[in-house]
Amino acid sequence: VDGQNLYDLDIENRTRQQIKSNIYKGKISRVEPSLEAAFVDYGVERHGFLPMKEISKIYFKKGSSPSSRLKIQEVISEGQEVIVQVEKEERGNKGAALTTYISLAGRYLVLMPNNPRAGGISRRIEGDDRTELREAMKGLSIPSGMGIIVRTAGVGRGTEELQWDCNYLLQLWKTINEESQKASAPHFLFQESNVIAVSYTHLRAHE
């Protein structure tokens, strides 16, 4: 809150544990050609559902041609380890929907460390604000192979503030990667839904 203006609001449901946006190191437990999907053991009783379109090319078998029309059994194998993020919570008898395209949300940006084609500025940002942010983004230093999206909270922020948030997210991704390399699947890596901890980290880092 700044004066009478609310700039940021974080809400967390305390009645049940949410796993949406959590990141895990999982293992392909079953490949289903008929569904064009795989099931992933990521540490819970009901295995997660990973559609073909949510599998990053970094996990494709050696020799696979990304340009050709591949079948899922030609891309991945049972027992293969993958880093996944929960896109949708478990519902009824259905397991959680997973993706290997990771998104890390900061205060002003969303970092997509393995999706260079994604990125840009939130659709809710229009007019002069959009133009100014586009200019600010030109000065950002982002590793190749990664993408970012500017959130609505980024309106009015310059290159320096956006770069600060980007650096924070890059360090977070590095930490997640290092933890993944040390651990065997299934293994929990990161929980985004801890609102208090995430908000406190951002506030402290920006003082």
Can you annotate each of these PLM segments?
Residues V1-R204:
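Single-stranded RNA-binding surfaces
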